[in-house]
C-alpha cells in the first residue's frame, strides 16, 4: 500500500485492505472504525479514510414506494418508501436537468432510486463487490454533475459513478483521514469534486479521485487551539466536530457549525485555515447554511430564525435580522428554498413545516403536516416544482405546489 510520503497537497490512491467496521446504532452516536477498499489516498496533514456506497440491506426492500394523499397540506404529499422503521433519510440528488432520475440516501445502508421525479422509489442494490452487507453504513451525501456522481458516508466510504448510477465503484481512502466525510459536491465535469469531513478537512480532485489536493492545512480543532485568543466564545481548546457543513454553490465558500452550536466557522477558496465566528444570538445555533441570494441563515434552539442582512457571509456577528415565526418552541432543523429562491421552507420537530414568500421575513405554518409523526431534517429542491423534505423513520414529503 502506498501513501504520499511528504506532500500535504496531494493524495495518491493505492490498494488497501479492509478493516472491520462496527455497526452504527443510532443517528447521532455511531461508534465505528474506518474501512478500506480498492483505492487509497493520503496527505501529510489530512488523509481520506475509505468510503463505500450504500447498498440495499435486505431483499425485503424490493417493494415499490409511491406518493399518497394522506396529508391535508397545500404544498406536500407523503411518499411511502420500501424501508424498515427507524431509517433516517439524509440526502437526495438527481442526475438529469428534468429531475426525473435520482437517488435518496439514509442510515442503515439505505439507497433508493427513482425514475419518475420521486413519486415512486425502489431499493438500489450495489452488490457485495462494492459494499459489505455486514457493515451498517450511514450515507451522508450524494451529488451529481450530469452522469457523474459521488456518495460519501460513515464508516468512511466514497462511491463514484460515471453512468448516472447504473454502476458504482468504491474509492479507497486512507485510515489517516481526519473525521468522517459528511459532504461531497460534484463541482465540474470529468472527475472534478470536493469532499469535506466533520473535522474540517477539505479535499479537491480533478481526475475522478486518482489524486486529491488538501485545501486547508489543518483541522478545525488544531486551528482553534492554536488561536486561543480569537475571541470566539467556546472556541478555545475545542475538541468537537462540525454538526453541519454547507457549501455556497456560487462562490465555493463553506460554513461549518460547531457540534455544540456555540460558534461557527467559514472557509473561502484560497484560505489556508477555517475562520471562527461568534453566533448572532444568545441561543445556540441548531443549523445554518446559505441562501439562494448568497446570504446566510441561522436556526437557533427553541425555534428562532435569523437571516444575514447582506447577500454574503456577514463580517460582523450582529449583521443578522430575526424572522417572524411562531414555532411554538419546536426546534427548527433546516431551511431551504425552491430553485429560484422565491419560496422558503423551514422544517423541524414533530412534523413542523413553515413557508415564507417574502424571503424569510414572515412565515406561515403548514398545519397539514402536523399529523406527520416524526422529525424533519432536510429541505431539498432540484427545480421550482420538484422538492422534498427528508425526515426520520423513513419520512419523505414530496412538493406538489400550492393547492
PLM feature spans:
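Intrinsic disorder/low-complexity segments
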Residues: 11, 22-23, 49, 53, ...
